[in-house]
């Protein structure tokens, strides 16, 4: 049976332990500016996926990935010392795609703003296809129209072939 609350608590604890150790405990020069963004632990608490971002170039990201791979054993033993679980979960470091996704979303939003500005410019210089006011107005009865019919149905009863309904 999976206890999601326990897995979430363990993930939060692992995130804190690993982030602290990366900040203060690892002296590898290949390790760049790393931010632990998320940790996900499986339901059986046997495996932890640690998502991280690196500020820098692609080369610095590759160097940081190599440094994390070499430090995985030390980080796992540190996690094992600081959590209260029977078994220490295995650790896997995954480069998080958040910065790339954020840049792609920013580019899409900028494209949408540009297109909105183009549409607004076209709307200002455009002309209406019909009347300026497309809504139907109530009919105003003029003096030249037949107003003298008492029953108001505007039927010419003197026309040839007219027969009243029975």
Swiss-Prot record:
Stretches the record annotates as Disordered: 119-166
Acidic residues composition bias: residue spans: 143-154
Organism the protein comes from: Clavibacter michiganensis subsp. michiganensis (strain NCPPB 382)
Any one Pfam family match given in the protein's UniProt record, by short name: RBFA
UniProt keywords, alphabetically: Cytoplasm, Ribosome biogenesis
Protein name (record): Ribosome-binding factor A
Compartments it resides in: Cytoplasm
Record note on quaternary structure: Monomer. Binds 30S ribosomal subunits, but not 50S ribosomal subunits or 70S ribosomes.
GO annotation, cellular component aspect: cytosol
């Amino acid at each position: 049976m999976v206890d999601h609350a326990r897995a979430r608590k363990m993930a939060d604890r692992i995130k804190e332990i690993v982030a602290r150790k990366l900040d203060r405990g690892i002296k590898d020069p290949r390790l760049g500016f790393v931010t632990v963004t998320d940790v996900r632990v499986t339901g059986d608490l046997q495996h932890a996926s640690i998502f991280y971002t690196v500020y820098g170039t692609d080369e610095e990201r590759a160097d940081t990935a190599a440094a994390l791979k070499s430090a995985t054993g030390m980080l796992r033993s540190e996690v094992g010392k600081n959590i209260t679980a029977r078994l220490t979960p295995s650790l896997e470091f995954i480069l998080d795609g958040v910065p790339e996704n954020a840049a792609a979303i920013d580019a899409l939003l900028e494209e949408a703003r540009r297109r909105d500005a183009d549409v607004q410019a076209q709307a200002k210089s455009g002309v209406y296809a019909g009347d300026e006011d497309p809504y139907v107005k109530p009919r105003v009865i003029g003096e030249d129209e037949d107003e003298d019919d008492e029953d108001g149905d505007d039927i010419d009863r003197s026309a040839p072939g007219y027969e009243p309904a029975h």
